[in-house]
């Protein structure tokens, strides 16, 4: 029953205490179960008298959706009850507050922290997308932190959520203007892709401290939403190329040009495949078993590739592990595998240099045969520049970028090249360059994995979040 006065209402089986927040038609309280477990929960109290037809529909949709889903990064609906005055949604309690407060008390988040958080949100969004559910009100205020010590994000407040197939279109305005996709305001016609825009705004705010349409007045906000100007990213702080690429593709005003859901989930910066999970260690171990087998067979290149792939899973396994003793054991193993990978790298690098020298005569002949093809000759020059960068110490990333640029051109030219000797030489050169690019990509990844493992060797993820995000 609801209690009199201005205090929290009374609900059988629970003791409601402090108010956590309130919205248009609901107030959320922290509560304790009266059972022996004394479980802490959050109870969303919705006053029946405040409900109109639209808000009743929103509430019923929220209950229907949350009843049927379980995901580590979506707030769990444990139960719901009602009495003559209120409807009560008994939810999982998240002690860390919301993402908006977390960002603003730290001003901005480092890219590595933002990436971990974005992986968690992308995982929840993928889960919803597979079930044709669109949230339609994604914003930092609707994203909760499980705690401040070891924060995990939890998507909350499904009041505007809808069952929407990718091809469904809606016309009813929903969401918060700062995080709303432009087509919701400008065309009043939208589909599930509006959630991708909102993810871009959330990431932008995490990295730069405010959303891209931050305004002093509603008229200024409306002008920014209706403008056709491209969303420009600040030059500071410095961000990785992949991070900037993702932001620009999420914050594309035209939904037909916006990144697709599948490309978002597969984007190298999101990298859901390597998200910390209970499966990370098993996948790393399976790859190491294969690497050791190839190593014993004398296939150094295959062994190196498998060790590098294993490291890509060992790092998230370290993030996921909470037991200090098991974490130390994983770190020790990672150190061994990195050392062996470095030895194999020297062997493979020496072999690759020999192959490059052997291929010089064929490469020179191809260049001679390309004299009447300026575009082909230019692409081969870029490939030569990539090789030179590769031989220079510390030039792996620049070399990889040049290889990828060259291959982008050469693959198109190969497809258009008529049969003949030049086509044969070009095909061989493309195969060689692709192998070099793949090898370099693994070296860059291995270096990043080793750096991250070394970082974890000094402090856990929660410490890293606290120390790197806290204002001095």
From Swiss-Prot:
Residues 280-348, 375-444 form the MIT domain. Residues 14-270 form the Protein kinase domain. It catalyses: L-seryl-[protein] + ATP = O-phospho-L-seryl-[protein] + ADP + H(+); L-threonyl-[protein] + ATP = O-phospho-L-threonyl-[protein] + ADP + H(+). Its EC number is 2.7.11.1. The active site is at residue 137. InterPro entries: Atg1-like, Kinase-like_dom_sf, MIT_dom, MIT_dom_sf, Prot_kinase_dom, Protein_kinase_ATP_BS, Ser/Thr_kinase_AS. Keywords: ATP-binding, Autophagy, Cytoplasm, Kinase, Nucleotide-binding, Phosphoprotein, Repeat, Serine/threonine-protein kinase, Transferase. PROSITE patterns: PROTEIN_KINASE_ATP (PS00107), PROTEIN_KINASE_DOM (PS50011), PROTEIN_KINASE_ST (PS00108). GO terms for cellular component: autophagosome; ciliary tip; cytoplasm; cytosol; phagophore assembly site; phagophore assembly site membrane. GO terms for biological process: autophagosome assembly; autophagy; cellular senescence; fibroblast activation; mitophagy; negative regulation of smoothened signaling pathway; piecemeal microautophagy of the nucleus; positive regulation of smoothened signaling pathway. Induction: Up-regulated during senescence. Signal peptide: none annotated. Widely expressed. Highest levels observed in fetal brain. In adult tissues, high levels in brain, liver and kidney, moderate levels in testis and adrenal gland and low levels in heart, lung, stomach, thymus, prostate and placenta. In the brain, highest expression in the hippocampus, high levels also detected in the cerebellum, olfactory bulb and optic nerve. In the central nervous system, lowest levels in the spinal cord. Autophosphorylated. Autophosphorylation is blocked by interaction with SUFU. It is an enzyme of class 2 (transferase). The modification Phosphoserine is found at residues 176, 300, 350, 384, 464. It is found in: Cytoplasm. One of its GO terms (molecular function) is ATP binding. It comes from the Eukaryota. ATP binds at residues 20-28, 44. Serine/threonine protein kinase that acts as a regulator of Sonic hedgehog (SHH) signaling and autophagy. Acts as a negative regulator of SHH signaling in the absence of SHH ligand: interacts with SUFU, thereby inactivating the protein kinase activity and preventing phosphorylation of GLI proteins (GLI1, GLI2 and/or GLI3). Positively regulates SHH signaling in the presence of SHH: dissociates from SUFU, autophosphorylates and mediates phosphorylation of GLI2, activating it and promoting its nuclear translocation. Belongs to the protein kinase superfamily. Ser/Thr protein kinase family. APG1/unc-51/ULK1 subfamily. Interacts (via protein kinase domain) with SUFU. This is Serine/threonine-protein kinase ULK3. It comes from Homo sapiens (Human). The gene is ULK3.
């Amino acid at each position: 029953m609801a209690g009199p006065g201005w205090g929290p209402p009374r609900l059988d089986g629970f003791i409601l205490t402090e108010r956590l927040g309130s919205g248009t038609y609901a107030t959320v309280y922290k509560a304790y179960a009266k059972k022996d477990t004394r479980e802490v929960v959050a109870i969303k109290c919705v006053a029946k008298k405040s409900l109109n037809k639209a808000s009743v529909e929103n509430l019923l949709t929220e209950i229907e959706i949350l009843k049927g889903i379980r995901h580590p990064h979506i707030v769990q609906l444990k139960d719901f009850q009602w009495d003559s005055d209120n409807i009560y949604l008994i939810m999982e309690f998240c002690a860390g507050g919301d993402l908006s407060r977390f960002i603003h008390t730290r001003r901005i988040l480092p890219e590595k922290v933002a990436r971990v958080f974005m992986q968690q949100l992308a995982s929840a969004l993928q889960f919803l997308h597979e079930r044709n559910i669109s949230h339609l009100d994604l914003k930092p205020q609707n994203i909760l932190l499980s705690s401040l010590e070891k924060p995990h994000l939890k998507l909350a407040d499904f009041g505007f959520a809808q069952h929407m197939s990718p091809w469904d279109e809606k016309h009813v305005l929903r969401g918060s203007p700062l995080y709303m996709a432009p087509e919701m305001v400008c065309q009043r016609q939208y589909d599930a892709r509006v959630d991708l825009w909102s993810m871009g705004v959330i990431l932008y705010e995490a990295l730069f401290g405010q959303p891209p349409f931050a305004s002093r007045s509603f008229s200024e906000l409306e002008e920014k939403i209706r403008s056709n100007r491209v969303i420009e990213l600040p030059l500071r702080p410095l961000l990785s190329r992949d991070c900037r690429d993702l932001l620009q593709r999420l914050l594309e005003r035209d939904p037909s040009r916006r990144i697709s859901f599948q490309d978002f989930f597969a984007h190298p910066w999101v990298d859901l495949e390597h998200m910390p999970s209970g499966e990370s260690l098993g996948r790393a171990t399976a790859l190491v078993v294969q690497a050791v087998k190839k190593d014993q067979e004398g296939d150094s290149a295959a062994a190196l590739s498998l060790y590098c792939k294993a490291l890509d899973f060992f790092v998230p396994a370290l993030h996921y592990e909470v037991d200090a003793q098991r974490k130390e054991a994983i770190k020790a193993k990672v150190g061994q595998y990195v050392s062996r990978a470095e030895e194999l790298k020297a062997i493979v690098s020496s072999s690759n240099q020999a192959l490059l020298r052997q291929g010089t005569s064929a490469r020179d002949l191809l260049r001679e045969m390309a004299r009447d093809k300026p575009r082909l000759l230019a692409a081969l020059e870029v490939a030569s520049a990539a090789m030179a960068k590769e031989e220079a110490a510390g030039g792996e990333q620049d070399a990889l970028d040049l290889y990828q640029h060259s291959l982008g051109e050469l693959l198109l030219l190969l497809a258009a090249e008529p049969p003949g000797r030049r086509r044969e030489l070009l095909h061989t050169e493309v195969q060689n360059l692709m192998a070099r690019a793949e090898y370099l990509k693994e070296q860059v990844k291995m270096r990043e994995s080793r750096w991250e493992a070394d970082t974890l060797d000094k402090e856990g993820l929660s410490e890293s979040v606290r120390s790197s995000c806290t204002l001095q």
